[in-house]
């Protein structure tokens, strides 16, 4: 499996886990960022995802923790996924370094 297939498979898996989650009704957007979004990934790179949820999802802490823990496939050949979660779309106004990078390089995938 080449790096493109590896990362595509990991993204598809993560998106399926998000859609299966009780949080799916609160999803505002999913943004791919990091080396994969910049086309600078290596074979061993992980995928970085920002999950933007509606404020109401804050009440679903257990589901949030469960999703974070299950966002990557158990298959050793698959890339790992790193999931960042934020609420509402105020992240776009943030001056935090991570959000500045996401605004610059991020690709909305859902």
Tell me what each language-model feature is.
Residues 1-29, 37-43, 54-110:
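Catalytic core of pol beta-like nucleotidyltransferases
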Residues 45-47:
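Short, conserved active-site loops that position catalytic residues or coordinate cofactors/metal ions
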Residues 49-51:
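Short beta-strand->loop micro-motif that forms the acidic, two-metal-ion catalytic signature
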